């Protein structure tokens, strides 16, 4: 009996020792993990963000000047685990509109009279990472502009809550009245933009041009610069529109069906053997990208003209219709801002709508990517700051704070500097 009691006490002590050892090891692991992590947070989201941040020590002017020591700092940060605020925290942060607006300094945005008289509309089709969406909104925000946000039916509750909070905090930000379940390369992606365009036309803001963005875009121009460039268009549209290759023609010469797939996208259009009829109204097919800068008159035409409606219906079972719908409509004779069919191709380099760096064209058409690649597209790194700002494009894709938080911070800083300088210059 005594022997059993001794064994029981030994077992208890051993159990306590093992549990204590596990807790110590876990705490050491957490400390090492935290020491090797960088937290990217808008000011005031959590208590941690009230303390000095690693990014505070980055000199963006030195990054712009490609000073080796400062570029080295950014590379050192990228070796660490980069942690961004989750959607729940952003939803909580944006729930108190007064505090949120003050801490993110929306109330300090400066604009000129020229900008006030030239409002811009935005269609933001997003589905995740509310922290990045908020940073995009802050970078393009001006009180005279108007912003439509289309989230995805599949987005998380916290993400949707954060988007709805943004709507609540600003009179010129709203959620699209109709929300799609967006599928990759499917008509739903095009419809998401069309839903926003319809709502934007119904708004009281008499915007001149509309620009569409996704959650991995970022501006390269200040609002003042955008207004200056948009005025130069003089009613024309700006987007890619080129004659399709044989491979691209396959996208609309055959019918596609949305099917379950075993990889990343889960569902996507799959080609069938059923040939499609030619497009209605003898529309000549051109291809481009999903990105556009469109005049109000052109959008009004697309939303109301039977030709455009018929073409949209014809495009329903094509592959990635957003990449040929706009490119083809821009060439239709008689549309506002028409680009004649006989005019040369407008490539992504000629159109200033979006700067995308493809890995197979690097070191031929543009410098090598200093970030990383995802599906052949460069996710920009800090060393590309100067090139991005001097290239001449208006927006770029792709950015990811978990890949390189420095490039986004420095773009924010440089664009704010430019807007301030331009406003002060107009006043003086």
Swiss-Prot record:
Key words of the record: Disulfide bond, Glycoprotein, Glycosyltransferase, Golgi apparatus, Membrane, Signal-anchor, Transferase, Transmembrane, Transmembrane helix
Principal location: Golgi
Disulphide bridges: 60-214, 148-369, 169-196, 378-410
Annotated protein name in UniProt: Beta-1,3-galactosyl-O-glycosyl-glycoprotein beta-1,6-N-acetylglucosaminyltransferase 4
Sequence similarity: Belongs to the glycosyltransferase 14 family.
GO biological process, one term: protein glycosylation
Membrane-protein topology: Single-pass type II membrane protein
Organism of this sequence: Danio rerio
Known catalytic reactions: a 3-O-[beta-D-galactosyl-(1->3)-N-acetyl-alpha-D-galactosaminyl]-L-seryl-[protein] + UDP-N-acetyl-alpha-D-glucosamine = 3-O-{beta-D-galactosyl-(1->3)-[N-acetyl-beta-D-glucosaminyl-(1->6)]-N-acetyl-alpha-D-galactosaminyl}-L-seryl-[protein] + UDP + H(+); a 3-O-[beta-D-galactosyl-(1->3)-N-acetyl-alpha-D-galactosaminyl]-L-threonyl-[protein] + UDP-N-acetyl-alpha-D-glucosamine = a 3-O-{beta-D-galactosyl-(1->3)-[N-acetyl-beta-D-glucosaminyl-(1->6)]-N-acetyl-alpha-D-galactosaminyl}-L-threonyl-[protein] + UDP + H(+)
UniProt key word Chaperone: no
Listed pathway(s): Protein modification; protein glycosylation
Residues in the Lumenal compartment per record: 31-428
Pfam families to which the protein is assigned, alphabetical: Branch (PF02485)
């Amino acid at each position: 009996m005594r022997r059993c009691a001794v064994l029981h006490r030994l077992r208890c002590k051993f159990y306590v020792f093992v549990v204590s050892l596990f807790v110590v090891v876990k705490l050491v692991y957490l400390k090492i993990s935290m020491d090797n992590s960088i937290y990217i947070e808008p000011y005031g989201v959590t208590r941690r963000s009230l303390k000095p941040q690693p990014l505070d020590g980055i000199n963006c002017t030195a990054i712009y000047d490609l000073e080796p020591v400062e570029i080295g700092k950014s590379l050192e940060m990228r070796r660490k685990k980069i942690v961004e605020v989750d959607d729940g925290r952003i939803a909580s942060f944006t729930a108190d509109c007064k505090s949120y607006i003050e801490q993110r300094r929306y109330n300090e945005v400066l604009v000129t009279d020229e900008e006030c008289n030239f409002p811009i509309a935005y269609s933001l089709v997003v589905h995740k990472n509310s922290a990045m969406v908020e940073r995009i909104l802050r970078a393009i925000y001006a009180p005279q502009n108007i912003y439509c946000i289309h989230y995805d039916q599949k987005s998380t509750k916290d993400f949707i809550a954060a988007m709805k909070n943004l709507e609540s905090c600003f009179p010129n930000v709203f959620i699209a009245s109709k929300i799609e379940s967006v599928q990759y390369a499917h008509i739903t992606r095009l419809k998401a933009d069309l839903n926003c365009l319809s709502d934007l036309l119904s708004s009281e803001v008499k915007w001149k041009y509309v620009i569409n963005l996704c959650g991995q875009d970022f501006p390269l121009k200040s609002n003042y610069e955008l207004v200056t460039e948009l005025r130069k268009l003089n009613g024309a549209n700006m987007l890619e529109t080129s004659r399709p290759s044989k491979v691209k023609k396959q996208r609309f010469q055959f019918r596609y069906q949305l099917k379950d797939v075993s990889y990343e996208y889960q569902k996507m259009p799959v080609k069938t053997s059923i040939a499609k009829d030619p497009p209605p109204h003898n529309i000549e097919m051109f291809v481009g990208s999903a990105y556009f800068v469109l005049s109000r008159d052109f959008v009004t035409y697309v939303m109301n003209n039977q030709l455009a409606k018929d073409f949209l219906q014809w495009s329903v079972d094509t592959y990635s219709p957003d990449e040929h719908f706009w490119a083809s409509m821009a060439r239709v004779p008689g549309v506002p801002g028409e680009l004649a069919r006989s005019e040369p191709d407008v490539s992504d380099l000629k159109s200033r709508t979006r700067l995308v760096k493809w890995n197979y064209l690097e070191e031929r058409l543009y410098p090598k990517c200093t970030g990383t690649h995802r599906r052949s597209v460069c996710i920009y790194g800090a060393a590309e700051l100067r090139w991005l700002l001097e290239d001449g494009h208006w927006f770029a894709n792709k950015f990811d704070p978990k890949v390189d938080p420095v490039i986004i911070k420095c773009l924010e800083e440089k664009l704010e500097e430019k807007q301030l300088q331009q406003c002060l210059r107009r006043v003086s």
